[in-house]
Amino acid sequence: PDVTKAKEKDFRATFEIKGKALYPQMKILFAMMREILMESRLDDEKRLKEILAMLKSRLQMSFQSSGHTTSALRALSYGSPLSKFKDDTDGIGFYEVVRGIEEHFEEKKAELIQNLKQLSRQIFRVDNVMISYTSSEDGLTPIEAAFREIKDTLYPELDGEETPCVLHCRKRNEGFKTSSKVQYVARVGNFIDHGAQYHGALQILKVILSYDYLWQNVRVKGGAYGCMSNFNRIGEGYLISYRDPNLKKTMEVYEGVVDYLKNFTVDERDMTKYIIGTISNIDRPMNPAAKGDRSMNLYMNHVSQEMIRTERSQILHAAQEDIRALAAVVEAMLKAEQICVIGSEEKIEEEKEMFLEVKTLF
Protein backbone atom coordinates (compact mmCIF):
# COMPACT_ATOMS: atom_id res chain seq x y z
CA PRO A 1 0.00 0.00 0.00
CA ASP A 2 0.96 3.63 -0.22
CA VAL A 3 1.88 5.60 2.88
CA THR A 4 0.97 9.27 2.66
CA LYS A 5 1.61 12.13 5.04
CA ALA A 6 -1.94 13.37 5.48
CA LYS A 7 -1.02 17.06 5.49
CA GLU A 8 1.45 16.75 2.63
CA LYS A 9 1.73 15.00 -0.70
CA ASP A 10 4.98 13.17 0.06
CA PHE A 11 4.58 9.43 0.10
CA ARG A 12 6.55 6.30 0.79
CA ALA A 13 5.70 3.12 -1.07
CA THR A 14 5.61 -0.10 0.94
CA PHE A 15 5.36 -3.80 0.14
CA GLU A 16 2.96 -5.68 2.39
CA ILE A 17 2.59 -9.34 3.28
CA LYS A 18 -0.20 -10.25 5.68
CA GLY A 19 -1.92 -13.28 7.14
CA LYS A 20 -4.22 -14.62 9.85
CA ALA A 21 -3.73 -17.62 12.12
CA LEU A 22 -4.88 -19.14 15.38
CA TYR A 23 -2.33 -18.82 18.19
CA PRO A 24 -1.07 -22.46 17.95
CA GLN A 25 -0.34 -21.91 14.23
CA MET A 26 1.56 -18.62 14.58
CA LYS A 27 4.95 -20.25 14.01
CA ILE A 28 3.68 -21.86 10.82
CA LEU A 29 2.32 -18.51 9.57
CA PHE A 30 5.63 -16.70 10.14
CA ALA A 31 7.56 -19.57 8.56
CA MET A 32 5.38 -19.30 5.45
CA MET A 33 5.93 -15.54 5.29
CA ARG A 34 9.69 -16.01 5.62
CA GLU A 35 9.69 -18.63 2.85
CA ILE A 36 7.63 -16.47 0.49
CA LEU A 37 9.83 -13.41 0.99
CA MET A 38 13.25 -15.06 0.91
CA GLU A 39 12.93 -18.35 -0.97
CA SER A 40 10.58 -17.63 -3.88
CA ARG A 41 12.06 -18.78 -7.19
CA LEU A 42 12.15 -15.59 -9.21
CA ASP A 43 13.94 -17.24 -12.15
CA ASP A 44 11.32 -19.90 -12.95
CA GLU A 45 10.58 -18.75 -16.50
CA LYS A 46 7.63 -21.09 -17.07
CA ARG A 47 5.90 -19.97 -13.88
CA LEU A 48 6.65 -16.29 -14.55
CA LYS A 49 4.96 -16.54 -17.95
CA GLU A 50 1.92 -18.18 -16.34
CA ILE A 51 1.72 -15.44 -13.69
CA LEU A 52 1.95 -12.70 -16.34
CA ALA A 53 -0.91 -14.25 -18.33
CA MET A 54 -2.97 -14.58 -15.15
CA LEU A 55 -2.26 -10.96 -14.16
CA LYS A 56 -3.20 -9.69 -17.61
CA SER A 57 -6.50 -11.59 -17.53
CA ARG A 58 -7.34 -10.51 -13.98
CA LEU A 59 -6.62 -6.86 -14.76
CA GLN A 60 -8.87 -6.96 -17.82
CA MET A 61 -11.66 -8.45 -15.71
CA SER A 62 -11.08 -5.79 -13.06
CA PHE A 63 -11.31 -2.98 -15.62
CA GLN A 64 -14.66 -4.35 -16.78
CA SER A 65 -16.12 -4.72 -13.28
CA SER A 66 -14.41 -1.76 -11.56
CA GLY A 67 -13.81 0.64 -14.41
CA HIS A 68 -15.08 3.56 -12.31
CA THR A 69 -12.23 3.33 -9.78
CA THR A 70 -9.73 2.50 -12.53
CA SER A 71 -10.62 5.61 -14.54
CA ALA A 72 -10.56 7.81 -11.42
CA LEU A 73 -7.09 6.55 -10.47
CA ARG A 74 -5.80 7.07 -14.00
CA ALA A 75 -7.15 10.63 -14.09
CA LEU A 76 -5.63 11.42 -10.68
CA SER A 77 -2.26 10.12 -11.94
CA TYR A 78 -2.08 13.07 -14.36
CA GLY A 79 -1.33 15.42 -11.46
CA SER A 80 -0.35 13.31 -8.45
CA PRO A 81 2.91 11.31 -8.05
CA LEU A 82 1.14 9.18 -5.43
CA SER A 83 -1.70 8.29 -7.79
CA LYS A 84 0.77 7.74 -10.64
CA PHE A 85 2.58 5.22 -8.46
CA LYS A 86 -0.72 3.49 -7.66
CA ASP A 87 -1.63 3.41 -11.36
CA ASP A 88 1.82 2.08 -12.26
CA THR A 89 1.50 -0.75 -9.72
CA ASP A 90 -2.21 -1.59 -9.80
CA GLY A 91 -3.93 0.30 -12.61
CA ILE A 92 -3.81 0.90 -16.34
CA GLY A 93 -0.10 1.78 -16.16
CA PHE A 94 0.59 -1.60 -14.56
CA TYR A 95 -1.56 -3.38 -17.14
CA GLU A 96 0.42 -1.80 -19.98
CA VAL A 97 3.68 -3.05 -18.43
CA VAL A 98 2.29 -6.56 -17.83
CA ARG A 99 0.88 -6.75 -21.36
CA GLY A 100 4.16 -5.57 -22.88
CA ILE A 101 6.23 -8.17 -21.01
CA GLU A 102 3.72 -10.99 -21.58
CA GLU A 103 3.51 -10.35 -25.33
CA HIS A 104 7.32 -10.12 -25.71
CA PHE A 105 8.30 -12.54 -22.97
CA GLU A 106 11.28 -14.16 -24.70
CA GLU A 107 12.97 -10.80 -25.32
CA LYS A 108 12.19 -9.37 -21.87
CA LYS A 109 12.40 -12.35 -19.50
CA ALA A 110 16.07 -11.87 -18.57
CA GLU A 111 15.51 -8.20 -17.67
CA LEU A 112 12.37 -9.12 -15.70
CA ILE A 113 14.20 -11.73 -13.61
CA GLN A 114 17.07 -9.33 -12.94
CA ASN A 115 14.66 -6.57 -11.87
CA LEU A 116 12.70 -8.90 -9.57
CA LYS A 117 15.86 -10.06 -7.82
CA GLN A 118 17.14 -6.50 -7.46
CA LEU A 119 13.81 -5.30 -6.05
CA SER A 120 13.75 -8.16 -3.54
CA ARG A 121 17.18 -7.18 -2.22
CA GLN A 122 16.18 -3.53 -1.98
CA ILE A 123 12.83 -4.12 -0.28
CA PHE A 124 13.29 -7.13 2.00
CA ARG A 125 16.05 -5.61 4.14
CA VAL A 126 16.67 -5.89 7.86
CA ASP A 127 16.60 -2.08 8.24
CA ASN A 128 13.44 -1.74 6.18
CA VAL A 129 10.91 -3.90 8.01
CA MET A 130 7.95 -3.00 10.20
CA ILE A 131 5.32 -5.28 11.73
CA SER A 132 1.72 -4.61 12.72
CA TYR A 133 0.27 -7.37 14.90
CA THR A 134 -3.26 -7.56 16.30
CA SER A 135 -4.26 -10.02 19.01
CA SER A 136 -5.49 -10.35 22.57
CA GLU A 137 -2.90 -10.09 25.33
CA ASP A 138 -2.58 -13.88 25.34
CA GLY A 139 -1.27 -13.78 21.80
CA LEU A 140 1.50 -11.24 22.39
CA THR A 141 3.99 -13.64 23.98
CA PRO A 142 5.27 -15.44 20.84
CA ILE A 143 5.49 -12.40 18.59
CA GLU A 144 9.00 -11.19 19.49
CA ALA A 145 10.66 -14.55 18.86
CA ALA A 146 8.70 -15.13 15.64
CA PHE A 147 9.51 -11.66 14.34
CA ARG A 148 13.18 -12.07 15.21
CA GLU A 149 13.33 -15.24 13.11
CA ILE A 150 12.04 -13.35 10.07
CA LYS A 151 14.30 -10.37 10.69
CA ASP A 152 17.40 -12.57 10.96
CA THR A 153 16.82 -13.96 7.45
CA LEU A 154 16.31 -10.63 5.65
CA TYR A 155 18.90 -9.04 3.38
CA PRO A 156 21.49 -6.73 5.02
CA GLU A 157 21.39 -2.95 4.85
CA LEU A 158 22.39 -1.36 1.56
CA ASP A 159 25.68 0.50 1.37
CA GLY A 160 25.48 4.20 0.54
CA GLU A 161 22.45 6.41 0.11
CA GLU A 162 19.36 5.35 -1.78
CA THR A 163 18.43 7.27 -4.92
CA PRO A 164 14.92 8.72 -4.60
CA CYS A 165 12.44 7.73 -7.29
CA VAL A 166 11.01 10.75 -9.14
CA LEU A 167 7.67 10.26 -10.87
CA HIS A 168 6.75 12.76 -13.58
CA CYS A 169 3.07 13.52 -14.16
CA ARG A 170 1.39 15.05 -17.18
CA LYS A 171 -2.21 15.67 -18.12
CA ARG A 172 -3.30 13.11 -20.69
CA ASN A 173 -7.13 13.21 -20.48
CA GLU A 174 -7.52 9.77 -22.02
CA GLY A 175 -10.42 7.94 -23.55
CA PHE A 176 -9.94 4.17 -23.45
CA LYS A 177 -11.98 2.16 -25.94
CA THR A 178 -13.27 -1.30 -25.04
CA SER A 179 -15.90 -3.68 -26.43
CA SER A 180 -18.29 -2.60 -23.66
CA LYS A 181 -21.44 -0.61 -24.43
CA VAL A 182 -21.27 1.46 -21.23
CA GLN A 183 -18.91 4.11 -19.88
CA TYR A 184 -17.01 4.74 -16.66
CA VAL A 185 -16.70 8.53 -16.56
CA ALA A 186 -14.26 10.22 -14.17
CA ARG A 187 -13.63 13.91 -13.47
CA VAL A 188 -10.93 14.55 -10.86
CA GLY A 189 -8.58 17.16 -9.43
CA ASN A 190 -6.66 18.34 -6.39
CA PHE A 191 -8.62 21.13 -4.72
CA ILE A 192 -5.77 22.10 -2.37
CA ASP A 193 -3.55 22.78 -5.40
CA HIS A 194 -6.20 25.25 -6.57
CA GLY A 195 -6.61 27.18 -3.33
CA ALA A 196 -9.23 25.27 -1.30
CA GLN A 197 -8.82 23.37 1.98
CA TYR A 198 -10.03 20.06 3.37
CA HIS A 199 -12.99 20.18 5.77
CA GLY A 200 -14.83 17.38 7.54
CA ALA A 201 -18.08 18.45 5.87
CA LEU A 202 -16.70 16.98 2.64
CA GLN A 203 -17.55 13.57 4.09
CA ILE A 204 -21.18 14.73 4.33
CA LEU A 205 -20.97 15.99 0.75
CA LYS A 206 -20.15 12.46 -0.41
CA VAL A 207 -23.43 11.26 1.10
CA ILE A 208 -25.43 14.19 -0.29
CA LEU A 209 -24.11 13.78 -3.82
CA SER A 210 -24.53 10.00 -3.77
CA TYR A 211 -28.14 10.12 -2.58
CA ASP A 212 -29.36 13.34 -4.15
CA TYR A 213 -27.65 15.30 -6.95
CA LEU A 214 -25.57 12.58 -8.63
CA TRP A 215 -28.19 9.92 -7.92
CA GLN A 216 -30.98 11.96 -9.50
CA ASN A 217 -29.03 13.23 -12.50
CA VAL A 218 -26.59 10.42 -13.34
CA ARG A 219 -28.49 7.35 -12.15
CA VAL A 220 -32.21 8.16 -12.32
CA LYS A 221 -32.26 10.55 -15.31
CA GLY A 222 -29.07 9.37 -17.00
CA GLY A 223 -29.56 5.62 -16.61
CA ALA A 224 -26.17 4.78 -15.08
CA TYR A 225 -25.95 1.84 -12.69
CA GLY A 226 -24.13 3.94 -10.10
CA CYS A 227 -22.33 7.17 -9.25
CA MET A 228 -20.09 8.33 -6.43
CA SER A 229 -17.63 10.94 -5.22
CA ASN A 230 -14.72 11.22 -2.83
CA PHE A 231 -12.56 13.93 -1.23
CA ASN A 232 -9.49 13.22 0.93
CA ARG A 233 -7.12 15.02 3.27
CA ILE A 234 -4.39 15.57 0.67
CA GLY A 235 -6.85 17.35 -1.61
CA GLU A 236 -7.69 14.65 -4.13
CA GLY A 237 -11.32 14.60 -5.23
CA TYR A 238 -13.28 12.78 -7.87
CA LEU A 239 -16.73 12.39 -9.40
CA ILE A 240 -17.33 9.06 -11.16
CA SER A 241 -20.09 7.08 -12.82
CA TYR A 242 -20.52 3.30 -13.10
CA ARG A 243 -21.86 1.47 -16.18
CA ASP A 244 -23.08 4.74 -17.64
CA PRO A 245 -24.78 4.92 -21.08
CA ASN A 246 -23.74 8.58 -21.37
CA LEU A 247 -20.46 10.48 -21.58
CA LYS A 248 -20.76 14.17 -22.43
CA LYS A 249 -24.07 14.46 -20.58
CA THR A 250 -22.47 13.07 -17.42
CA MET A 251 -19.57 15.53 -17.70
CA GLU A 252 -22.14 18.34 -17.83
CA VAL A 253 -23.78 16.97 -14.68
CA TYR A 254 -20.40 17.13 -12.92
CA GLU A 255 -20.03 20.78 -13.93
CA GLY A 256 -23.43 21.47 -12.35
CA VAL A 257 -22.36 20.38 -8.86
CA VAL A 258 -21.04 23.87 -8.07
CA ASP A 259 -24.37 25.62 -8.74
CA TYR A 260 -26.22 22.86 -6.90
CA LEU A 261 -24.11 23.48 -3.79
CA LYS A 262 -24.37 27.26 -4.00
CA ASN A 263 -28.15 26.89 -3.82
CA PHE A 264 -28.21 23.95 -1.39
CA THR A 265 -31.22 24.12 0.93
CA VAL A 266 -32.79 21.31 2.98
CA ASP A 267 -34.84 21.17 6.15
CA GLU A 268 -33.26 20.32 9.50
CA ARG A 269 -34.56 16.75 9.41
CA ASP A 270 -32.84 15.98 6.09
CA MET A 271 -29.62 17.64 7.23
CA THR A 272 -29.64 15.47 10.33
CA LYS A 273 -30.18 12.37 8.17
CA TYR A 274 -27.14 13.28 6.04
CA ILE A 275 -25.00 13.69 9.17
CA ILE A 276 -26.21 10.38 10.63
CA GLY A 277 -25.48 8.65 7.31
CA THR A 278 -21.96 10.08 7.31
CA ILE A 279 -21.22 9.03 10.89
CA SER A 280 -22.61 5.53 10.24
CA ASN A 281 -20.03 5.12 7.47
CA ILE A 282 -17.25 6.24 9.81
CA ASP A 283 -18.33 4.24 12.87
CA ARG A 284 -18.75 0.86 11.22
CA PRO A 285 -18.16 -2.17 13.46
CA MET A 286 -14.72 -3.70 12.83
CA ASN A 287 -13.37 -7.17 13.43
CA PRO A 288 -9.83 -7.52 14.85
CA ALA A 289 -8.23 -7.66 11.39
CA ALA A 290 -9.98 -4.43 10.34
CA LYS A 291 -8.96 -2.73 13.59
CA GLY A 292 -5.35 -3.71 12.99
CA ASP A 293 -5.40 -2.41 9.41
CA ARG A 294 -6.97 0.87 10.49
CA SER A 295 -4.52 1.47 13.33
CA MET A 296 -1.53 0.78 11.09
CA ASN A 297 -2.85 3.01 8.31
CA LEU A 298 -3.51 5.90 10.69
CA TYR A 299 -0.02 5.55 12.17
CA MET A 300 1.78 5.24 8.84
CA ASN A 301 -0.20 8.09 7.30
CA HIS A 302 0.53 10.43 10.23
CA VAL A 303 -3.16 10.92 11.03
CA SER A 304 -3.33 12.09 14.64
CA GLN A 305 -6.17 11.68 17.13
CA GLU A 306 -6.58 15.45 17.02
CA MET A 307 -7.14 15.34 13.26
CA ILE A 308 -9.77 12.62 13.72
CA ARG A 309 -11.50 14.57 16.51
CA THR A 310 -11.50 17.77 14.43
CA GLU A 311 -13.02 16.02 11.42
CA ARG A 312 -15.67 14.35 13.57
CA SER A 313 -16.60 17.66 15.21
CA GLN A 314 -16.87 19.36 11.82
CA ILE A 315 -19.23 16.60 10.66
CA LEU A 316 -21.43 16.62 13.78
CA HIS A 317 -21.76 20.41 13.85
CA ALA A 318 -22.15 20.98 10.10
CA ALA A 319 -24.96 23.27 8.95
CA GLN A 320 -26.37 24.10 5.54
CA GLU A 321 -24.03 27.05 5.14
CA ASP A 322 -21.06 24.68 5.58
CA ILE A 323 -22.34 22.58 2.68
CA ARG A 324 -22.88 25.68 0.53
CA ALA A 325 -19.30 26.73 1.29
CA LEU A 326 -18.09 23.48 -0.29
CA ALA A 327 -19.04 24.86 -3.71
CA ALA A 328 -15.63 26.55 -3.68
CA VAL A 329 -13.92 23.22 -2.97
CA VAL A 330 -15.65 21.45 -5.87
CA GLU A 331 -14.98 24.44 -8.13
CA ALA A 332 -11.28 24.22 -7.23
CA MET A 333 -11.28 20.49 -7.98
CA LEU A 334 -12.91 21.03 -11.39
CA LYS A 335 -10.28 23.65 -12.30
CA ALA A 336 -7.77 20.83 -12.75
CA GLU A 337 -9.79 19.67 -15.79
CA GLN A 338 -8.53 16.09 -15.47
CA ILE A 339 -10.77 13.46 -17.06
CA CYS A 340 -10.54 9.80 -17.98
CA VAL A 341 -13.20 7.59 -19.54
CA ILE A 342 -13.23 3.84 -20.10
CA GLY A 343 -16.05 2.96 -22.47
CA SER A 344 -17.46 1.96 -25.82
CA GLU A 345 -15.53 2.66 -28.99
CA GLU A 346 -18.56 4.33 -30.55
CA LYS A 347 -19.19 6.75 -27.67
CA ILE A 348 -15.54 7.72 -27.22
CA GLU A 349 -15.04 8.29 -30.96
CA GLU A 350 -18.22 10.38 -30.95
CA GLU A 351 -16.79 12.66 -28.23
CA LYS A 352 -13.08 12.36 -29.13
CA GLU A 353 -12.58 16.15 -29.13
CA MET A 354 -13.03 15.95 -25.37
CA PHE A 355 -9.78 13.97 -24.97
CA LEU A 356 -6.08 14.62 -25.49
CA GLU A 357 -5.46 10.93 -26.19
CA VAL A 358 -7.76 8.18 -27.44
CA LYS A 359 -6.56 4.58 -27.38
CA THR A 360 -7.76 0.98 -27.20
CA LEU A 361 -7.47 -0.58 -23.74
CA PHE A 362 -7.87 -4.22 -24.82
Positions of predicted regions on the chain:
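Charge-rich, well-structured scaffold segments of protease-associated domains
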Residues: P1-P164, K221-F362
